[in-house]
């Protein structure tokens, strides 16, 4: 019995055996579920007329397993879905309507907030329109009052008696354009030197000569000479100390250049103190 071989089993080959097995499994899977049969037939319709020649491959037999199982709706519902207009079209039309009506002037309906805002704006504009005439009237009053006050001030100034210094200032302005307010200001030492030179030799150091020497107007020299202000003794002492420091600084610079500084033995021949010896 062990050595005996079945003739029917010897006729079976491996390809035919595998074909029978997969056919039975495929029929068992698709038998109770008719909806999958119809769906598979709809999706694989172009391949229905083809004949498979030769042994079937594993990739062609496993197509049923690759079919997605998520879409469980019947073919009737799929047909209904295909007959229903797609949702993209109304969405597009709605978007077009929204874009067309995005202009605020074309919007028919408005919310209560927008109505209240419009009402407030209208009331504010009316208030401003009503307030403008009052503002214009007040501005007209101010403008009409300003010329009156200016004219009154001019009249009061003209009627008021001028001071002597004002009369002199006006006369100087007419006679000397820059004499009453010279652009060049002289130092106190220069003013003292002008007074001293004019006091020592009035015939030599006249007003035009001093004006040319100090580069100021003759009127400025005249006012300097006419001035009665004199410095106090303390101020004179400070000026003398300042002049001495200036003298030392100048001679230190000259000694750096190679010039000799005067000695004390030559002080009696110097005329430095002449400025302080003679009265002003």
From Swiss-Prot:
Subcellular location: Mitochondrion
Keyword DNA repair: no
Main localization, broad class: mitochondrion
Biased composition regions of type Low complexity, renumbered to the chain: 73-86
Bias (Polar residues): 63-72
Chain positions covered by the region annotation Disordered: 63-166
Pfam families per the UniProt record, alphabetical: Neugrin (PF06413)
Alphabetical UniProt keywords: Mitochondrion, Transit peptide
InterPro entries: NGRN/Rrg9 (IPR010487)
Function comment: Required for respiratory activity and maintenance and expression of the mitochondrial genome.
Family, per entry: Belongs to the RRG9 family.
PANTHER family with a match to the protein in the record: NEUGRIN
Protein name, UniProt field: Required for respiratory growth protein 9, mitochondrial
